[in-house]
């Protein structure tokens, strides 16, 4: 990794290693001026944003090659810090030389703050069951139950949007009015108080018996009248 950074009195820090185990990193410093600067390799737990003077700073100037060795344990991180009384640009190049391999596997970009803290990696997607089928789901989703509830809410909202229209309410009001009319006006007794009798002709009354049962031509027949 190679990076040119403006170094001032507030330290800028680089993560040397954040993987558990021993490490060896070569740091090449190439300042743009002959002004002195300071460097230190230490653990992150000893490097804070309020007090830097208690760190074992090394004073130097010009080009410099530093080999930083250490062992990462307990989740701590090793950092390489730079500061300069007179602000200057310094090119920083780092190589991970663990096991003789030259790479920048453990090296991270510098920070704009007192020390660099890379963001944590995003959690992997969880595997949930959707109606018996396994599939990858988003982190904020809790699975099939949440998805089903969301669908029900969407369907209910669509139904309410359809029902909540003036023409629909007009139709519902007309239907309710018709049912009330049928129940209270078409089924109530007429002319006999509360006796329960309805205003419908009875078929076996003497007044209507002959004329109702047979046509008028039969009632005028003498044989029919005599037989009655």
From Swiss-Prot:
Q: Where are the transmembrane segments?
A: 167-186
Q: Does the keyword Protein biosynthesis apply?
A: no
UniProt topology in membrane: Single-pass membrane protein
Record's GO cellular component, any one? membrane
Where in or outside the cell? Answer: Membrane
Asked if the Swiss-Prot or TrEMBL record annotates the protein with the keyword Cell membrane, the reply is no
Point out the glycosylated residues in this chain.
48, 58, 140
The organism's place on the tree of life at top rank: Viruses
The record's region (Disordered) falls at 106-125
Per UniProt, the keywords (alphabetical) are: Glycoprotein, Membrane, Transmembrane, Transmembrane helix
Stated family = Belongs to the ascovirus HvAv ORF58 family.
The name on file for this protein is Uncharacterized protein ORF43
Q: Which organism is it from?
A: Spodoptera frugiperda ascovirus 1a
């Amino acid at each position: 990794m190679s990076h040119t950074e403006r170094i001032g009195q507030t330290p800028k820090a680089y993560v040397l290693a954040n993987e558990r185990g021993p490490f060896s990193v070569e740091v090449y410093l190439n300042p743009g001026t002959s002004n002195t600067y300071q460097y230190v390799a230490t653990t992150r737990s000893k490097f804070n944003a309020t007090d830097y003077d208690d760190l074992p700073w090394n004073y130097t100037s010009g080009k410099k090659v530093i080999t930083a060795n250490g062992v990462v344990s307990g989740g701590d991180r090793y950092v390489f810090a730079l500061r300069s009384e007179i602000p200057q640009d310094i090119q920083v190049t780092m190589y991970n030389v663990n096991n003789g391999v030259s790479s920048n596997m453990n090296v991270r970009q510098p920070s704009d703050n007192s020390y660099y803290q890379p963001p944590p990696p995003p959690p992997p997607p969880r595997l949930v069951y959707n109606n018996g089928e396994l599939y990858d789901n988003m982190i904020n989703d809790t699975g099939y139950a949440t998805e089903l509830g969301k669908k029900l809410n969407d369907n209910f909202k669509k139904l309410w949007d359809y029902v909540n229209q003036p023409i629909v309410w007009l139709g519902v009001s007309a239907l309710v009015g018709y049912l009330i009319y049928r129940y209270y006006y078409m089924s109530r007794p007429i002319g006999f108080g509360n006796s329960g009798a309805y205003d419908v002709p009875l078929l076996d009354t003497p007044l209507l018996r002959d004329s109702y049962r047979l046509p008028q031509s039969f009632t005028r027949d003498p044989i029919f009248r005599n037989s009655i």
